Amino acid sequence: MTLAYAPTAQTITIRNDWTKAEVEALFAMPFNDLLFNAQVVHRQHFNPNEVQVSTLLSIKTGACPEDCKYCPQSARYDTGLEKERLLEIEKVIQRAKEAKQVGSTRFCMGAAWRNPRDRDMPYILKMVEEVKSLGLETCMTLGMLTRDQAVALKQAGLDYYNHNLDTSPEYYGDIITTRTYEDRLNTLENVRAAGMNVCSGGIVGMGETVSDRASMLVQLANLPEQPQSVPINMLVKVKGTPLDSVEDLDYFEFIRTIAVARIMMPKSHVRLSAGREAMNEQMQAMCFMAGANSIFYGCKLLTTSNPDTHEDVMLFKKLGINTERTRDYSDEAHQQVLEEEIAQQQEQAEGSNDLFIDATKPKVAAKQQHATEA
């Protein structure tokens, strides 16, 4: 008998009214209790044995005018990074094809800009169209966006736009001075208004306090609509940046941040993002237990190191994790299909001695997907 997780049709109400005191209380929970609660939430909305996989490519590297203290791409710091012009569309398409071949379902493109210039937009839009034509989900991070730029990206086929809040409003001024917190929130509003999915998270380990981490998650969870994707980054210290000698964050604190994010944002994909190169397999496994269900494939994230794809494949094999496939139907339809599947399996289980419902092979969902494809 194969034992698998037993999902439930019960859902958790999405809250946009979290207080910092509530979130600090979550951070203060005993570690095992916190992870247990995060797992309960996670299993009500996701298959815990599936992870969404993206690939991230730097399409324009270095010479950024911003002063983000963690970033090796800032022109203000001597990090030895060679600046590069906007990548040719043909090279971007080739990298997207390679990403699809190794199992990525989303291709993310990042440019070290304060904001895209009008002269660059035609090339950017063409990149989106070409990558989208490969059957991949598309994501970009280009800095701040105007409403018109967001609409143009949406019309070109962009699915996700990444713009992180980075840290709490209280600590933000210690990390960045060249753009305001409000600037970031305005860009997220422009992305939402254009009808794109929001990808927004932050970085931990920059010298912030637990209260700062709680405050950052409050900002994300209390947005008018919670981000569809929430990357949680561990600071990668780069020589030459102002944060290259900051004290290391305790790994358990990072895992706690993943777990609290999962509890607060039940339907969001929580991405185990930058910093994985320094994590052993056991720590990454605990992050997945805490509710992380998205990673980047590939040996580099923009300019910093990332585990080799082969290493990730082997880790997934050890943990029994499969890569999540792109859904061809809406979230609402999928929820209905899932509930029907659960009810069907519960009826079947009443006449058997199985202790677990096997929901790893959703027959009803598969039928609907085949019908959609037909």
Curated annotation (Swiss-Prot):
Domain of life: Bacteria
UniProt pathway annotation: Cofactor biosynthesis; biotin biosynthesis; biotin from 7,8-diaminononanoate: step 2/2
Reactions it catalyzes: (4R,5S)-dethiobiotin + (sulfur carrier)-SH + 2 reduced [2Fe-2S]-[ferredoxin] + 2 S-adenosyl-L-methionine = (sulfur carrier)-H + biotin + 2 5'-deoxyadenosine + 2 L-methionine + 2 oxidized [2Fe-2S]-[ferredoxin]
Keywords: 2Fe-2S, 4Fe-4S, Biotin biosynthesis, Iron, Iron-sulfur, Metal-binding, S-adenosyl-L-methionine, Transferase
Cofactor binding: number and manner: Binds 1 [4Fe-4S] cluster. The cluster is coordinated with 3 cysteines and an exchangeable S-adenosyl-L-methionine.
Domain Radical SAM core residue range list: 49-276
Pfam families hit by this protein: BATS (PF06968), Radical_SAM (PF04055)
Known cofactor(s): [4Fe-4S] cluster; [2Fe-2S] cluster
Family matches, as InterPro entries: Aldolase_TIM, BATS_dom, Biotin_synth/BioAB, Biotin_synthase, Elp3/MiaA/NifB-like_rSAM, rSAM
Stretches the record annotates as Disordered: 344-374
UniProt GO MF annotations: 2 iron, 2 sulfur cluster binding; 4 iron, 4 sulfur cluster binding; biotin synthase activity; iron ion binding
CDD domains, alphabetized: Radical_SAM (cd01335)
Function: Catalyzes the conversion of dethiobiotin (DTB) to biotin by the insertion of a sulfur atom into dethiobiotin via a radical-based mechanism.
Family: Belongs to the radical SAM superfamily. Biotin synthase family.
Binding partners and assembly: Homodimer.
Stated name of the protein: Biotin synthase
Organism of derivation: Alteromonas mediterranea (strain DSM 17117 / CIP 110805 / LMG 28347 / Deep ecotype)
Gene that encodes it: bioB
